[in-house]
Amino acid sequence: MKRTLVVAGLWLASALALAAPVAVKGYNHVKSVGAIDEYTLQSNGLQVLLMPEHSTPTLTFMVTYRVGSRNEVTGTTGATHLLEHLMFKGSKNHTREKGNNVDQLLERTGAKYNATTFLDRTNYYENLGSEHLATVVGMEADRMRNLLLREEDRKPEMTVVRNEFERGENSPIQALYKEIYQSAFVAHPYHHSTIGHRSDIEKVSIAKLREFYDTFYWPNNATVTIIGDFEPAQALELVKKSFGAYPHSPKPIPEMYTEEPEQTGARRVIVKRPGQLGVVAVAHKVPAATHADFAAVQLMSAILTDGKNSRMYKAITNKNLSTGVEGDLGIFHDPSLHMVFAPLAPGAKHEEVEAIILAEIERLKKDGVTEAELQAAAAKVAADAAFKLDGSFGIAGNLNEYISAGDWTLFYGLDEAAKKVTVADIQRVAQTYLTENSSTTGWFVPTQPGAGGAAKPAKAGHQAERAGGPFYYRDPQHSHGSVGVDLASAKEPGGSGGAAGAKMAPNVRRSTVAGIDLMAYPTGVKDVVTLRASLPAGRAQAGAGNPSIPVLTSMLLDQGTKSQDKFAIAEKLESVGASISFRAGTDVLDITARMLKKDIPLVLGLIAEQLRTPALSAEEFAKAQKQLAGGIKRSLESTDFRASDAFGRAVYPQGHPNRPVAPDDMLAAIESAKLDDVKAFHADHYGPSNMKMVVVGDVDVAALQAEVGRVFADWKGGKAVARAAQSAPAVGATTQDVAMPGKTSVSVVLGQPSGLRYSDSDYQALRLATAILGSGFTGRLMANVRDKEGLTYGVGAGLGNDMFNDGDWRITATFAPALLDKGIASTQRQLTLWYDAGVTPAEISARKSNLIGGFKVDLATTGGLANTLLAAVNRGYGPAWLDEYPAKVQALSDEQVNAAIKKYLKPQSMVVVRAGSLPAAQ
């Protein structure tokens, strides 16, 4: 029998001071927990959650429906997700024909918006300027009960969702995850994936979807959440005006009552597909998120799999048997699974890794955990409690999971419950849930290594991941909202505490400290601090030398220093819930850190120590070689990677920093790399010269400057970023094929060198024109190739790789093999029309509103602001650029925008790359 977690009452009295309930006619105030007030609309039972937070002029509006794939049966699997897609196709008062459908309405505001479907829920959200609250309330209310649900919309959207299904099937890990759930659950509907079975996706009728809509989309089965800059009384009136027009559902919402019978023996699944490296996963059934044991299960999972001091890292990853063990534990309404995923390193055996995972689980059950392990896991929970309050969008996203689990107060309650977990609790839940009889073990076994070499010219006649997660209306990994990432989406100063339109640059405290260009931006967020930094030690800095050396050097930074080993460093970070990461990009070493205010000295000291005096030991060097080789081999399983990789080599000449090294060549370079080369690269390229550091959040500027000066004192050295001559488009179009048998979706890249850096005078004009072609659902590509023709889940166009050197212009898309030629032809048809006829004044005006209107959204978190400020200075602008950007976009003339298309692009000379199971290869 399920036990309910009851912790809110223990601390409710102290939390009430944070809440500010208001009395509005027509509502019942239910309770206040933490900073959140819960109301019920009396007329129809709609639940409303409000959390005012005025540090930035943005808000997030979200509607969560308590219907997910757990409410589906055989024959209708995937219906919840397909219905989610159709929720964007028009409602009574919001249609494409009227020029105000969801995409047209929201993209004009610059909103971030999407929808997700998962096991227990479907949710729709908008993150936008607070002045647009009335707009989104009216739109969301309209589609709650006035959806058009037309057959002419279902047909093309079915093939869109089918391509989304096919894309997921391309991933061995996602396929294994799906098979494990199908084996672990035989009765409960968690058995089937949220995306559904292919035949159900293809055959579900519009009548069945209408029945689903009329059963579950009612106010009494929904929660409206508003987080951010708004006045509660006004917001409640807006919600009542729009959502209050609908009655309570005419029938009770059907209850999903199926319970999974007790499992009486271990289960196994094996997935065999083309791929590079194997995977081992071990899953056990665990209780629902509302169960009293769940907080202990979360901490147990962290002790097993989270960080360098986790049990699985030490037993598997640290012994070169995996490229990185991960744990998977969702926040679900019903009992689900805890999984340990171990992608195998080259040469590792499934049997050996599985045996180690099981042995570590048994050791945990037999011997328990130490107090130090528990305190480190609890510290992460405490820090995450602060981090999840960094921006309205993150708060709403976290809250959504607890709403769907059945108790939104778990947003606070699980954090409180974690404080009370003991080492005895950890051992008890391990013994209770990590049993052999409740386990399902899965292997992914690659049947062939797949093609790993360079792309081959196409034959004549052919024209031009978390494993388990929700399914989205639009791919969250694909930028639809802006083109030219980083600075392109710079917004008003999130967290500055100023009013909309306030200048950003005066809030940036810029100074040179110990040779480092240091920028600090204090915001209104409490406790949270994000650090972003860079120095010229990226992959391009290898020059004509071994291309793996910069990457291997970056990988060794967090593997111990001359003063302490990696486990001691990890223990210090984990004890306060902080994190530091290093990554060698194309041009620079990227440094990211997140911490609480009190831990700034600790984190800065560790960053300085890791940059200045890494151990660079032979033992860790050998491990890094194997890890890097394993990562490259695993990337060869991705059609997206293979297409982008081949495209990069096709458009950039030898010696250009942006030209990728062929995978086979990089694997050979890793094997031949020498530790002495790493030491020489570190000595030559690491130093404060050209290093930039941005710190944003709850920061004392003077104290920060003093601490940076102390920990980096007397550090010398460093290099400038590698520069290159401009690339030139090829003469004559070419098509390159990368054959990857067994893939159900083909990735396509079409484009050319742009010849532009972000700082060039024509860049913004071409960027705006490109956004009209390929950004968002109002972009021509998505509006036609996806929405009208239903040929793809995702297609877009953008500029990129242009921070320090000239970059490229590209269109990316995915198509089913059977629709490949038709999809490419449709894409090229839109490209030709855009190039020949140009863009209209109306399109230019709307896209300017999108870019400028979205200015105040992306910087509403410390991370977003830090990323954007660092990108600005790396591109040669001062912080003032963030204030100047809207005016520069607004000043672009129609003539400039259209002239940029013709000046820089040559569709007749573009490269097309196709990667996947190609018709010619079948």
Give short role names for the model-derived ranges.
Residues 89-96, 144-152, 366-370, 611-619:
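Short, polar/flexible loop-turn hinges at active-site or ligand-entry regions and domain interfaces
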Residues 1-4:
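Positively charged n-region of N-terminal signal peptides that target proteins for export
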Residues 17-49, 231-272, 314, 413-534, ...:
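Proteolytic maturation boundary segments
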Residues 7-17:
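Bacterial N-terminal signal peptides
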Residues 162-168, 258-271, 379-388, 595, ...:
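Short, conserved secondary-structure transition motifs
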Residues 22-39, 103, 138, 164, ...:
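Histidine-acidic residue clusters that define the catalytic metal-binding segment
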Residues 51, 55-82, 97-143, 173-199, ...:
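M16 family metallopeptidases and their MPP-like homologs
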